[in-house]
């Protein structure tokens, strides 16, 4: 191992040990399943904001977005970022406070639990379907995080991808299963700081090695359509592509996904004071906009570095930040330690999402299927054991899915994002803003939204032309329409449900 690799390893080991220690500390504070899954609703506004956005950004912030910008310019990635920024703001503005109050009023600690109690579904069918959808889409989403860790260590140290991926999974599972929601939230808060430091260091060093910002822009301008948000760059033909109105709307639709992301919505449910949501919203939006803009710029800088010969040509564009960090590590001991911080940032972006996803998937299986659907009564100790065993079991499945070293982080995240947005987005909005929405509409909307994601991606989109759009948009619309139509043609909600809705509506 070289001196640079040793310095990088030291930084990463310190980071990983710190994450596990946080899990150990919070394991002593986790007394029941309410603490394990929702932290007792005691999350402060700053931790709520930063942990929500760190768990949101995942590995696509430091791998997916820069990689996409590098190979295709600003068109697709630019509109994606705009859609995500708008979606983030609207989610905090119209969903966060209402969901916090509603979930506390009906004593719901998971998203399936919220839907079941909101619609007074005594059959538990809504809870079961919601839990099943969470597991279906979260397991591959978590697998993408494990895959990112495997790529990181494999590229850096020549470690076998599978060994690196399994070790990373063990660390994530370790601190999450020990400390639950509070551990995940605190580590996510710390990880958001590390991710920020990583982005800044990479950008400054990259611009310097590329010959300055003027040279970066000049290189980008030499590539046809690279900086044009209505064209984009086609690397295969070395010419400008085409990014018309349909593709723009389709890509902006990424923002719709936020209304249905269980691991983000759980943070809204956990904030200590609903009146502090405004503080969280401002912090979250500022961090998201700046971090995504820097991530995209790093991709553009990476292309300039390749053109200037500062970086060799490499196959996997999603490893651009790893490539820049490796170059930095060769400058000296201190730069190598900084490179370690950068790479810990990639780990942070992955782990901050994976831990939250594991909690959501594990709660869906243990709380909502075992305890909810099958009505198996367990004491607090048994519930905690089941929660942790379920979390480990789901992680094992994630490792199996991530076993293919050629899997694309951006591709997996894109599909899972569409799934959650289409399944839970429409029903979440209607549950908060339309009192005529009932359990029949909610159930039908979730099922149709989930099915349409698969149908559109694997069948309709292949027709091309106007049908070649991001599956989230048509699936979201279908789920919304079905929910509304079915609600209108079936009996209206019980008086008790409407009373609670009106009570919260007037309780500003």
Predicted regions and their residues:
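Membrane-embedded helix-loop-helix hairpins and adjacent transmembrane boundary segments
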Residues: 1-508
């Amino acid at each position: 191992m070289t001196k640079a690799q040793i310095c990088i390893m030291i930084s990463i080991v310190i980071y990983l040990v710190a994450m596990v220690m946080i899990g150990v500390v919070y394991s002593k504070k986790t007394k029941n399943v309410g603490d394990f899954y929702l932290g007792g609703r005691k999350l402060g506004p700053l931790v709520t904001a930063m942990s929500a956005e760190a768990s949101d950004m995942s590995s696509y912030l430091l791998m997916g977005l820069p990689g996409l910008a590098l190979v295709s310019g600003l068109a697709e990635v630019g509109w994606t970022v705009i859609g995500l920024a708008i979606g983030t703001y609207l989610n905090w503005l119209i969903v966060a406070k209402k969901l916090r109050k509603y979930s506390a009023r009906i004593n719901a600690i998971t998203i399936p639990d919220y839907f079941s109690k909101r619609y007074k579904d005594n059959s538990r069918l809504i809870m079961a379907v919601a839990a099943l959808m969470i597991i279906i889409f979260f397991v591959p989403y978590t697998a993408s995080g494990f895959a990112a860790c495997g790529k990181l260590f494999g590229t850096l140290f020549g470690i076998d991808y599978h060994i690196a991926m399994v070790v990373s999974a063990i660390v994530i599972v370790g601190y999450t299963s020990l400390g639950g929601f509070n551990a995940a939230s605190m580590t996510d808060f710390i990880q958001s700081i590390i991710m920020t430091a990583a982005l800044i260091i990479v950008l400054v060093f990259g611009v310097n090695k590329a010959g300055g910002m003027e040279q970066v822009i000049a290189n980008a301008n030499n590539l046809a359509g690279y900086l044009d948000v209505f064209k984009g760059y086609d690397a295969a033909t070395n010419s400008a592509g085409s990014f018309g109105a349909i593709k723009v709307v389709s890509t902006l639709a990424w923002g719709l996904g936020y209304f249905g992301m269980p691991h983000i919505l759980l943070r809204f449910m956990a904030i200590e004071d609903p009146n502090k949501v405004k503080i969280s919203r401002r912090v979250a939006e500022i961090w998201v906009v700046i971090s995504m803009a820097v991530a995209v710029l790093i991709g553009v800088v990476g292309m300039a570095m390749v053109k200037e010969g500062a970086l060799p040509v490499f196959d996997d564009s999603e490893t651009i930040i790893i490539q820049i960090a490796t170059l930095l590590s060769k400058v000296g001991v201190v730069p190598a330690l900084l490179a370690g911080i950068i790479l810990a940032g990639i780990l942070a972006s992955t782990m901050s999402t994976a831990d939250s996803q594991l909690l959501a998937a594990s709660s869906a299986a243990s709380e909502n299927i075992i305890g909810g659907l099958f009505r198996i009564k367990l004491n607090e100790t048994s519930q905690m054991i089941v929660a942790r065993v379920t979390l480990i079991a789901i992680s094992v499945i994630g490792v199996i899915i991530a076993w293919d070293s050629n899997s694309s982080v951006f591709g997996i995240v894109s599909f899972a994002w569409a799934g959650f947005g289409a399944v839970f987005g429409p029903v979440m909005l209607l549950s908060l803003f339309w009192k005529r929405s009932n359990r029949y509409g909610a159930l039908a909307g979730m099922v149709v939204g989930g099915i349409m994601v698969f149908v559109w991606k694997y069948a309709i989109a292949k027709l091309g032309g106007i049908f070649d759009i991001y599956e989230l948009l048509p699936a979201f619309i279908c789920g919304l329409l079905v929910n509304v139509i079915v609600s209108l043609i079936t009996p209206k909600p019980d008086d008790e449900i409407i009373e609670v809705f009106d009570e919260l509506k007037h309780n500003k």
